[in-house]
């Protein structure tokens, strides 16, 4: 997907005018350009090489990366939601560098999104790329569309999960994953 900086700048300027602001005042005159550059930066961060390793000593237990901090934008209100992602997988023939799990989260989070789909997209992508015995993804997030508008009740977490393979089919694997996520 290509970013159209000019359209973004025009849209931000129109938005500012639409809410009664003067887009030419000192604090706002560079805002359209800043927002366009931000989306260009997001687009660059979404592209990465999912380097996989097939020689890893036959490790066949759970690999878990906890507390991956993320932020995204609610596609309904364009307000942030943010929190932590926990990803686990059980290798079959391939493993990933741990940083690639963080990059996977970032790649799917840096666009207008809903948490439920974000959870599914991360799990589906890792299942496709790693071909593991199973994948588990849990996301805990606070949504500013609930905290600063509507019900205006900050501090609540929404928790979503996506389970694939043995994480879905084997209750013991699922329980181990959820206990490790909770830190028990």
UniProtKB/Swiss-Prot annotation:
Q: Which pathway is recorded for this entry?
A: Cofactor biosynthesis; 7,8-dihydroneopterin triphosphate biosynthesis; 7,8-dihydroneopterin triphosphate from GTP: step 1/1
- Catalytic reaction annotation: GTP + H2O = 7,8-dihydroneopterin 3'-triphosphate + formate + H(+)
Keywords per UniProt: GTP-binding, Hydrolase, Metal-binding, Nucleotide-binding, One-carbon metabolism, Zinc
Checking SUPFAM superfamilies in the record gives: Tetrahydrobiopterin biosynthesis enzymes-like
Fetch the PROSITE patterns from UniProt. GTP_CYCLOHYDROL_1_1, GTP_CYCLOHYDROL_1_2
Would you say which domain of life the source belongs to?
Answer: Bacteria
Cystine links in this protein are none
Gene3D superfamilies per record: 1.10.286.10, 3.30.1130.10
Specify which residues bind Zn(2+) according to the UniProt entry for this protein: 74, 77, 145
One Gene Ontology molecular-function label: zinc ion binding
Family of this protein? Belongs to the GTP cyclohydrolase I family.
Q: Which HAMAP family match?
A: FolE (MF_00223)
What is the name attached to this protein's record? GTP cyclohydrolase 1
What gene is this protein a product of? Answer: folE
């Amino acid at each position: 997907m290509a970013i159209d900086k000019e359209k973004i700048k025009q849209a931000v300027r129109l938005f500012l005018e639409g809410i009664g602001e003067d887009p030419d005042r000192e604090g706002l005159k560079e805002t359209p350009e800043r927002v366009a550059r931000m989306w260009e930066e997001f687009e660059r961060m979404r592209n990465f090489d999912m380097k996989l390793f097939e020689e890893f000593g036959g490790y066949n237990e759970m690999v878990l990366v906890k507390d991956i901090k993320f932020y995204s934008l609610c596609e309904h209100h364009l307000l942030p939601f943010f929190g932590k992602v926990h990803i686990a997988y059980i290798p079959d023939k391939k493993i990933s560098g741990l940083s690639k799990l963080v990059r996977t989260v970032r790649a799917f989070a840096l666009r207008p999104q809903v948490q439920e789909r974000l959870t599914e997209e991360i799990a589906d992508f890792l299942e496709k790329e790693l071909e593991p015995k199973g994948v588990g993804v849990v996301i805990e997030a606070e949504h500013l569309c609930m905290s600063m508008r509507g019900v205006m009740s900050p501090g609540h977490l929404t928790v979503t999960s996506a389970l694939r393979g043995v994480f879905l089919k084997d209750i013991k694997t699922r329980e181990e994953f959820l206990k490790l996520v909770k830190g028990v």
